[in-house]
Amino acid sequence: MKNRFDVLVDFVIESITGGVREVYVMLCDGSTYLITSLPSQRARAVARWLLSRQPFKTSLQAIIAKYRSVYYLHERGRDISEARLDGNGLYIFGDHDGLSREDEELLAKHAEWISLGSTPYMSWHAAAYLAYLLKRQV
């Protein structure tokens, strides 16, 4: 998320505290962070911690290959209430600009596009709602 590190931190906090086992954060330059736990639920502490971590380089395709079920949250996706969600799946969130054309072409082949409806949501709101839906399924 360009120039919105605060939103990224909120997304990570909401995802992990919502019960997600791991969060991949992939930046525009390909730097990727794998987060499986947090040192705190306070945004400032999480931000410092994230900045101190060493990123690794990978591709979206390599991450997708690790999962049987892949979902892309997009405004043009199928209504989430009609989808059969896999709690062990990979859920991909973009920012308000969306993903690159290349990434969306890859996801058109390898992911089910799902939507929370016509209302745009911040990614961290969407993460919290998705966590709620997945917990309700169990």
Swiss-Prot record:
Return any one Pfam family short name.
Methyltrn_RNA_2
Q: What is its main location?
A: cytoplasm
Superkingdom of the source? Answer: Archaea
Stated name of the protein: tRNA (pseudouridine(54)-N(1))-methyltransferase
Give any single GO term for biological process.
tRNA methylation
Q: Which GO terms describe its molecular function?
A: S-adenosylmethionine-dependent methyltransferase activity; tRNA methyltransferase activity
Q: Which reaction does it catalyse?
A: pseudouridine(54) in tRNA + S-adenosyl-L-methionine = N(1)-methylpseudouridine(54) in tRNA + S-adenosyl-L-homocysteine + H(+)
Alphabetized UniProt keyword annotations? Cytoplasm, Methyltransferase, S-adenosyl-L-methionine, Transferase, tRNA processing
Q: What class of enzyme is it?
A: transferase
The entry's family comment says: Belongs to the methyltransferase superfamily. TrmY family.
Q: Which residues bind S-adenosyl-L-methionine?
A: 73, 94
* Subcellular localization: Cytoplasm
| PANTHER family, sorted | TRNA (PSEUDOURIDINE(54)-N(1))-METHYLTRANSFERASE
Q: Spell out the subunit comment.
A: Homodimer.
Query: Does the record's keyword annotation contain Cytoplasm?
Result: yes
Alphabetized InterPro entries for the sequence: Alpha/beta_knot_MTases (IPR029028), TrmY (IPR007158), tRNA_m1G_MTases_N (IPR029026)
Keyword Transferase recorded: yes
